[in-house]
């Protein structure tokens, strides 16, 4: 078997590092062909020394220059590229077999679309591609003959729980024809699911980033605490699985053992279970339709004391309700909400606003954006930019 060339968009982030771990566990199957990051020179330098990619790219031009000099000094032949255009070109490189799209935020949008337009096999971990582009993105996957495989643990669980006919029709699944009655999206509820609501005003960034089950970056950890993460995943699931609002259900499952479920019309429920480790869905997508070793500890059923399920409380998780309503309002609303949330979460981490302010800023930003039918990627970027400015203004007020 010839080694698969993997391009990792966001190699210095949490998903990127987990992807490199899977590659390290399967050196005979995969090669880290190109590594892409933002401006973290040290992390990228260490990855280049260990994995010897053909290419490394950083979005920050000055950081790329420093990286290039360090690699030359250590006689590492990796070619260093810089800037957004170079990253998009790597995402579409003719020698790339699979693209791990894991750049967090709207910054990952254009490189991911480049991979899709090159007809690549895209392992999708970037939520924003679907949250902001939705129909545009799904249509591009179909029109350019790209293969889309969901990496998010919940969407990957749903994917694994669906019949092969649905797996081959991502974005256009005829759920009712296949006997699917509900897609059940599970979430841990974050670290504050039992915290009294009156204490929410005192929540600190340190408390918010301490997720009880998953190891994640700061932004995603805060999103998990507000359940915006689940809201974004709800939007993603609607697009990925062509699901109506009536075909969706969100439940809180504190143990994070069941990663999501599919309910069928005959009364069956198929669930995907496993230890909360992102290497499992990453390995599943990389090897699909086969399986490969991920380095993950097998689930020990004797250590699982209980599996519990709770109905989400929208008073506790206003961001979840906001995301559900934003999907119903249209693509402009989900794009604005996503942009505002990125700004609001960073402001919270920088101690400029309170934990409770995040949802308020997101909601007010959507209210201030005029309803608009998105026609193309330029429309998406325009609304994204508008929403960011509105959110920044709201933070200053």
UniProtKB/Swiss-Prot annotation:
One example of a Gene Ontology biological process annotation: isopentenyl diphosphate biosynthetic process, methylerythritol 4-phosphate pathway involved in terpenoid biosynthetic process
The catalytic activity of this protein is classed by the Enzyme Commission as 1.1.1.267
What positions does the entry give for Mn(2+) binding? 152, 154, 233
Q: Which pathway does the protein contribute to?
A: Isoprenoid biosynthesis; isopentenyl diphosphate biosynthesis via DXP pathway; isopentenyl diphosphate from 1-deoxy-D-xylulose 5-phosphate: step 1/6
Catalytic activity from the UniProt record: 2-C-methyl-D-erythritol 4-phosphate + NADP(+) = 1-deoxy-D-xylulose 5-phosphate + NADPH + H(+)
Q: Would you indicate the residue range of the signal peptide?
A: none
Judged by the first EC level, this protein's enzyme class is oxidoreductase
Chain positions recorded as 1-deoxy-D-xylulose 5-phosphate binding sites:
127, 153-154, 188, 211, 224, 229-230, 233
UniProt similarity note: Belongs to the DXR family.
Q: What does this protein do?
A: Catalyzes the NADPH-dependent rearrangement and reduction of 1-deoxy-D-xylulose-5-phosphate (DXP) to 2-C-methyl-D-erythritol 4-phosphate (MEP).
Q: What is this protein called?
A: 1-deoxy-D-xylulose 5-phosphate reductoisomerase
Q: Please report the organism this UniProt entry assigns to the protein.
A: Haemophilus influenzae (strain 86-028NP)
Phylogenetic lineage: Bacteria, Pseudomonadati, Pseudomonadota, Gammaproteobacteria, Pasteurellales
Provide the gene name from the record: dxr
